[in-house]
């Protein structure tokens, strides 16, 4: 039976490159030169933004978002927390989300069922497996999911006949 998986994955090398580009851009910006830092933690997939003032944090976050877009990484995967004061400086944490949580998986399954397509969707950990009798039905399911707006970027892989 033909099937495919709906996943939400990040290319970790591209994320690292985007953060490196944001660091270089921060050094080039005259208004932010020497006033802020990006600290990327590879294991946790988080970026700690540090600046003197809160408006500088907002500008740094915008630099990071632009760097992600240039590297073709969807900014929906970036989850930011509220800024907080730490001594004389302000800090803000940004986390890269990966994987489909249960709530999003349920929305995906409900969307497929509401589409009344001849496919079945099953939640398997951090992915959703969609199976059907015909390849065309699966392609319709992919088209349906692409038209909907979800709070995470979705990829379709492991397409099997």
From Swiss-Prot:
GO terms for cellular component: cytosol. Keywords: Nucleotide-binding. InterPro entries: DUF520 (IPR007551), UPF0234-like_C (IPR035571), UPF0234_N (IPR035570), YajQ-like_sf (IPR036183). It comes from the Bacteria. GO terms for molecular function: nucleotide binding. The keyword Coiled coil does not apply. The keyword Cell cycle does not apply. PANTHER family: UPF0234 PROTEIN YAJQ. Belongs to the YajQ family. Nucleotide-binding protein. This is Nucleotide-binding protein PP_1352. It comes from Pseudomonas putida (strain ATCC 47054 / DSM 6125 / CFBP 8728 / NCIMB 11950 / KT2440).
């Amino acid at each position: 039976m033909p099937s495919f998986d709906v996943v939400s994955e990040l290319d970790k090398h591209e994320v690292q490159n985007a953060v490196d580009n944001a660091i270089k851009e921060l050094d080039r910006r005259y208004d932010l030169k020497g006033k802020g830092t990006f600290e990327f933690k590879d294991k946790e997939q988080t970026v700690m933004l540090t600046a003197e003032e809160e408006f500088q944090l907002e500008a740094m976050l915008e630099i990071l978002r632009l760097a992600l877009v240039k590297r073709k990484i969807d900014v929906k995967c970036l989850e930011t927390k509220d800024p907080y004061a730490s001594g004389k400086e302000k800090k803000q944490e940004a986390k890269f989300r990966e994987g489909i949580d249960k709530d999003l998986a349920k929305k995906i399954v409900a969307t497929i069922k509401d589409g009344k397509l001849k496919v079945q969707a099953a939640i398997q950990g951090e992915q959703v497996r969609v199976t059907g009798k015909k390849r065309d039905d699966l392609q319709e399911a992919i088209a349906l999911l692409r038209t909907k707006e979800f709070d995470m970027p979705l990829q379709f892989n492991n397409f099997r006949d």
